[in-house]
Amino acid sequence: MYQVDLNSDLGESFGRYTIGMDEKIIPLISSANIACGYHASDPVVMLESIARTKEAGIKIGAHPGLPDLMGFGRRNMAISPEEAKAYTLYQISALGGMCQANGMRLQHVKPHGALYNMAAKDYALSLAICEALRDYDPEIIVMGLSGSEMIRAAKDCGLKAASEVFADRGYEEDGTLVNRRKEGAMITDEDEAIARVIRMVKEGVVTAVTGKDIPIQADSVCVHGDGEKALLFVEKIRKVLTENDVQICPLADIIG
């Protein structure tokens, strides 16, 4: 039987602002990426997110981003590898400490937004992030875009690497995600998106925007839980994966 992890970005509310539908999405996933206070979240939300995932028996991952609350961490910033390492270590240490205080530990780390995309193409940036993770916990799993520099850097650092794919995003021939401003960036047809996931998991290929099939490794599928439609999609993708002999389980069970 095939295995895959379903992950979602959570804990992105802060102060009086509520973002996402965490309570409804948590039971549907196997790994949670919790924001660490830079692009979103705050200490209270972080603790609440840990409590919710613990109660549901879901594995916790840190979701560090750039220090850009106004831009939700989606705007590129000119940062050095040294800054990337410090930003990462600062955020995962905060969330990791809260996890420890609640009898939990971080399973994985997945950078957020612009930091994720920048690192996917920049080996030096990826290496700095992975060095921070290795310094924090050499057993932690690094989640990054399948085939990216982040995956290469993780392996070079001796870390466990989990290749992530996206159900609702288009791919370029080089394996990178199509820019959101370009045509073909988003897969809006649910059945098409799910069929692509099944193919990525079982066949290890995905069709790029050019129409060419490219190789891809699918250890984890990112799903979004903001909005009722997205919630229904997650329920549907779980059902179809199970019907196609794909077992949904946390990264720790897949990467080992």
Briefly describe each language-model feature range.
Residues D9, H63, V109, V223:
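Conserved, mostly hydrophobic/aromatic
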Residues G15-M21, A40-R52, A120-L127, S146-K155:
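Active-site-adjacent beta->alpha loops and helix N-cap segments on the catalytic face
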Residues T18, D22, A32-H39, M70-K85, ...:
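Glycine-rich tight-turn/loop motif centered on a GG-T
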Residues E23-P27, E48-G61, Q100-N102:
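Acidic (Asp/Glu)-rich catalytic clusters
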Residues D68-H108:
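Glycine/small-residue-rich loop that forms an oxyanion/phosphate-binding "nest" at active or ligand-binding sites
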Residues I140, L232-G256:
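C-terminal domain-boundary segment and adjacent tail
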